[in-house]
Every structure is written in C-alpha cells, then in structure tokens.
Amino acid sequence: MIAPLVCLDPGHGTPPAIGRQVEPIGPGSRELKIKDGGGALGEAPVALAIALRARRLLLARGYRVAMTRTGPTIHLGDGDGNIARARFCNRRHAALMVRIHADGSTDRSQHGFSTLVPAWHRGWTDDIYARSLRAGRALQRSALAATGAADRGVVQRSDLTGFNWADVPAVLVETGFMTNPTESRRLKTGAYQQRVALGLVRGIAAFVSG
C-alpha cells in the first residue's frame, strides 16, 4: 500500500520581481491578484523552519512528503506564483496541501493561531470544500492543543489563489503574528516551531486517517 503524500507549502520566498506580477485568482477568472506580497517581516524563514520540522515528523510516521520549497527561494517554474504552488500539489495527488504562514497586522496586540480553508465556489472549490473544512478543523484543534495559542478559528476564504486552483484538499495555517513582539519572538525559537510542527502533523494524521 502506498503511503499518503502530504504537500507542504511554506509561504512566500518568491523573488520580488516575480512576486509583483499578477495571475488569475481562479480558473477562467478575469480578476487578477498579485503573486506574492512578501508577507510579514521574518515570515518566510519561520514558515520554512516549521515546514522542515513537519516534514521530518511526517516522514518518521511513514508519510510521503513533497515541499514547494526547501530553501529561501521558490523555484517551481510555471510562473512561481500561487497557481504554481497549487499545481505542484495537484500533480502529486496530495492527500492534503498544507500552506504554512504567519500573520501580520497594524495592531501589534493581535495574536493567535487561525486556519484558513477554501470557501465553496462552483467550479473552483466545490470538489474540495468539505474535505478541506474537515482538515482545517482537525489542524486547528491539534495545533491549539500543542501550542496553547489563542484560538482565532477556522476561516473560509474565497480570495486566495492557492485555494481556488487546488484540486486537492487544502488549508492555510496562520501560525501566529510576526507583528506581535511576544508571538514573533516565540515563533523564531526552535522549541516553539517544533510544537507547531507537531500540532500540524497530529492534525494531518487525524484528517488522513479519518
């Protein structure tokens, strides 16, 4: 029996010249969205560190793992935007695509962990909506248990290109706020990154086995 494949997508890491380009927000859409706004200060390396830790834990549990990037910069080809990230996971028939990010806000007091999932949209996400929602709830629950972070909930989004082009269940975890001084310091520590990764992996396992 072939082990399930989990596709980890550490956010950002797109070269600025490419990130400023635009791409359709969904298949057949005339609405265009920037490929990569750059994220919060320090977000890209934190996302990668958590993803690499999650990969090690998943491999130890017998899962197969694919990653959209394993270094500072993404090199997928295919435009290197969020469409390319989704297609990378689609081609591998991933059991789940986990997009790993950290949040940001002009309000430095904002803090906590949230999981974004695709909103239902006919022709775009209708085939992955229910499974993505189930996965999102599983990851949010397990991540909170592992980290003790404040619960910002599971949020449905219709405006994320990486969701709208996905043909496999997909979630996006906002692991904390880089703009909150306390949370930013925590997210940069290996110990906390390991707790986040463990929470994600437990949630992934609960979803895949369910």
Which residues fall in each region the model found?
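Solvent-exposed loop/turn segments at secondary-structure junctions
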Residues: H12-P15, A40-L41, G71-H75, A102-D107, ...
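Mature extracellular/periplasmic domains of secretome proteins
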Residues: G81-A95, L160-W165
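Active-site-adjacent mobile loop/cap segments within catalytic or ligand-binding domains
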Residues: R99-D107, L116, A150-G210
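Active-site histidine-acidic residue metal-binding/catalytic motifs
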Residues: M1-A86, A119
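Soluble periplasmic/extracytoplasmic beta-strand elements of cell-envelope proteins
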Residues: L5-D9, R64-A66, L96-H101, S114-L116, ...
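Soluble non-cytosolic domains of exported or imported proteins
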Residues: L41-A49, L76-I83, D126-R134, L187-R195
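Active-site-adjacent substrate-binding region
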Residues: I128-D159
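Sec-exported extracytoplasmic/periplasmic mature domains
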Residues: L52-Y63, N90-A94, A102, Q140-A149, ...
